[in-house]
Amino acid sequence: MREALDIRVHGIVQGVGFRPFVYRAAKHNLIDGWVLNGIDGVRIHAEGEASDLDDFVLELSEHAPAASRVEEILLDEVPLEGFDSFEIRHSDETSSDATTLISPDLATCDDCIRELFDPDDRRYRYPFINCTNCGPRYTIIDALPYDRPSTSMAAFPMCPTCAHEYADPADRRFHAQPDACFDCGPHIYWKETADAATPTDSDVHENADTNARTRTLRDRYPELEWGSDLTASDAIIERACSWLHDGRILAVKGLGGFHLVCDAANPETLAELRARKRREGKAFAVMAPSLDAVRACCAVSPEEERLLVSPAHPIVLLKKKPGAVFAAGLADDLSELGVMLPYTPLQHLMLAEFGSMLVMTSGNVHDEPIQTDDEAAWKALAGIADAFVGNDRAIETRFDDSVARVIRVGGEAAVQLIRRARGFAPMPIKLARPTNGTGQEHADAPIILAVGPEQKNVLCLLRGDDAFASQHIGDMENAETFDAWLEAKDRLERLFDAKPTVIARDMHPEYLTSKWADEVRRTHGIRVMDAQHHHAHIVSAMAEHGIDDAVIGVAFDGTGYGFDGAIWGGEILIANRVDFERFANLTYVPMPGGAAAVKHPERMAFGALWAFDLIDHPGARPLKDRLGDAANVCASMMERGLNAPSTSSVGRIFDALSALVGICAHARYEGEAAVLFEAAIDGCETRDAYEIAIVKNAATAESTAHDTSVVLLDSEPLFRGVLDDLTAGTPVHVIAAKAHNAFVQAIVQTCLLAQAAYDIRTVVLSGGVFMNRYLIEHTTASLMEAGFTVAINRELPPNDGGLSYGQAAVASARLGSE
């Protein structure tokens, strides 16, 4: 007996070939009816025998396209309408509940790569080849549902051949919205920086909105050298690679913005790029032409290989092979290199032509967001790039490359994200929300906007139990980055039809995002909820793992506003999602000069030695000699209590130790001193450790559980031990290993004390210091050996890039407890 079902599929089901998959599954299971894209996902009307309908629904759930993610399938019995075939219908734009999830951009698939290099294929060497399994998604979407008119591909009407493929259910490009070829475009162009470009008058129209959607850069600048056919396109690629071989720097437009590109093996060009971009020491990421090229210079485990070739194609931090030679200025003094493989057709063509590794670094001016608009890039990057390889497909939102690594946790490989952007965002991260006393359902829960921190900003929009963490935005230090933050916020709210009614923010009153939240509260009356920085770190990992009960939370990072007004960063908390107690913290040390101590770690070292009365230790003499007169200035600030804030930050202690042993006196980028201190371990396997004393803290009448810990982690013995070893001539790699081991032991010992006091055996590790591979791998192993269950961030970075998710989780929990 025939029956009919109304089927709604929620998840990442648009832009990933889901409707063609449904069509084929319907044909396979003898189902009649239709499928369409709705604002709330994919909707299907299915008619057939009951057993065939069961098989059809099972196929939908178990054999969906690899790039899709089915969150739920809702079934309702409906009356038969008498269909005798199955069809794909035009999208439904009338649904009122915008619950569709949008796919991130996907790296070029193997089928498209084969066609790209097949001389007999009509898309041979076409720089924008794609299909339903790969290509741009989120970076070209302007509105939902995901159809070509709602993307930046609206400006490129399909040629008859592409239109036929698009309409053929048996074709891999059936309903592939970015589908294109040389005949219909888009196309690349070549522009030398010295060449002026003047837009034509024809770009001015009465309807500016229509113009923006249907006019292209080529309409505005027809005089540029355009790669309109195979010959012209190849000529641009060949010239670009010739310039790169000659030591030039190019700006090349990618999926989410421009890259600055140069020969990774040319030290003179690397030095020039650093000078032009004002990027003094931070390592460059490289793009390799193949896995074999990566294996030639880096150790690649099976897990790292899978990450490199995954649909996200992130930059993967790999250990350099012993004896591998790298150009000066690429990733000096580091044991790891950031490597990625080509993920766009143009990159495949350029890397194949060039033949070896290229530097691919974000196309931006120092401390500003990545450039996405061609005309703006010509101006902003004119002082950096010698020429531009751009195109006339508009980028709807800026995206940097994601960065990840594989670490060992409890003997098993785990992916740790360092920067979550292209290939991952805007996929939501589930955040189970508690109901309040009225049994409020998730869908009716307030929409929360978590505005994120000051550094490595990512914002997060919580709708129901879907947390939409934005792409990496950057450090909120200038108007340009704040504008990018506003753009990302507005885009998330618009695409997911989610207007926040609650704002979650960091406690720090001077953060730009905190001030923005204050202004919104004042002008719109929206509720604003504060989340302490380190509590949000811990809750970010708790929420990822669905942990509701209290945990021992170890939050180690560089900074964070504390309840006592000091700069925290070495915290061990007893925390649930709603609140926390400060169980332990690293002893405070002064930061002479405040922010200057971050840029000049020798000041940090001097401050620690001054606080611990170790200035006159013989091992401190080289530090004082290097500081010279600055030592007296630092001492004066600390004695008078002027511009010498106190901090418990582990990040700052690693900075101080790095400077003390002579590794890094001046940090050229955020975290450099600590990064180099970890790199100095250089395979040292000593189990010896300095001491970090655990002592009972003294409370005062004003003390609270929020600001006064039960015990202190006293780092005076650590610094004394380092000074003793410096005096004795102990090698720096041994000192670095012993210092790291000291923190591992202190964490385990303190967690054992907390477990005895609170009967908690789950430990959560979060905060930027846990990007330190040595520390997180040794700490997780030691905690597990001690019988603890350990949770770390998996879908988000442990650094401030995961903080907004934690802010949203804290606010949600507090609302649920009211």
Predicted regions and their residues:
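Conserved phosphate-binding catalytic cores of ATP/NTP-utilizing and phosphoryl-transfer enzymes
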Residues: R295-V300, L349, I370-A377, S402, ...
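A phosphate-binding glycine/aspartate-rich beta-alpha loop in the early core of alpha/beta enzymes
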Residues: E77, I249, G257-K320
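Short glycine-rich phosphate-binding loop at a beta-alpha junction
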Residues: A251, D497-P509, V528, Y758-V769
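Internal gly/pro-rich beta-alpha loop/helix module
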Residues: H63, E165, R173, F354-G437, ...
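A contiguous, well-structured pocket-lining segment that forms one wall/lid of small-molecule binding clefts
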Residues: G185-H187, P453-D483, E487-R491, G607-I760, ...
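Active-site histidine-anchored catalytic micro-motif
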Residues: M542-W610, I615-P618, E639, T647-S648, ...
